Amino acid sequence: EEAAALSGRNFGATELGYVFFGWGLALAVSSVFIAPRLTRAFGLIPVVVTVLLGFSAVLAGLGFGAHRLGVVVVLVILAGFFSGVFNTVLTEAVMEATEMPRNVASSSYSGMRFLGGAVAPAVSGPLAASLGAGVPYWFGAASLVVSLLILFAGRKTLHRIL
């Protein structure tokens, strides 16, 4: 809303729907067609690392450009690409990293992912209201960098998926 207001444009439900259609299309195409090709070509861990870095850069860009409507629109759609690849490769990694039955591993992973989706609005709204519209994106970018550091720190225990 803030970026639209600053740009002097009316940005209602229809316009928001177009943006999230673009996001969803990028997510679907990248998760079904691009992610499998990337993991076959480069391997799981290099793709995870690249996606974490790329998605972190997109979120940082949103942090910088939170007040510019064009930047927000383009980067939200680009975030769909990274989300699609990351969802596919992370699901693949979770399934390979455990000896639990696939349905248990899948539902556990989905539960954690949806928990994050439930917490994010409750955290990002107050962050944006009190510290500025770009702060939730910075928080997200930082959390992806921390997850990358955790991945590197635990790489010896991840031998099953390397």
Regions found by a protein language model. Name each.
Residues 87-97, 110:
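Intracellular helix-loop hinge segments at the cytoplasmic ends of transmembrane helices
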Residues 30-44, 128:
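Helix-to-loop junctions at the C-terminal end of transmembrane segments
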Residues 126-144:
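A membrane-interface helix-boundary motif in multi-pass transporters
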Residues 45-90:
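C-terminal transmembrane helical hairpin of 12-TM major facilitator-type secondary transporters
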Residues 7-26, 104:
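Loop-to-transmembrane helix entry
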Residues 20, 24, 52, 106-114:
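Small-residue-rich transmembrane alpha-helices and their cytosolic helix-loop interfaces
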Residues 100-129:
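A late C-terminal transmembrane helix in Major Facilitator Superfamily
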Residues 141-162:
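Multi-pass alpha-helical transporter architecture, strongest
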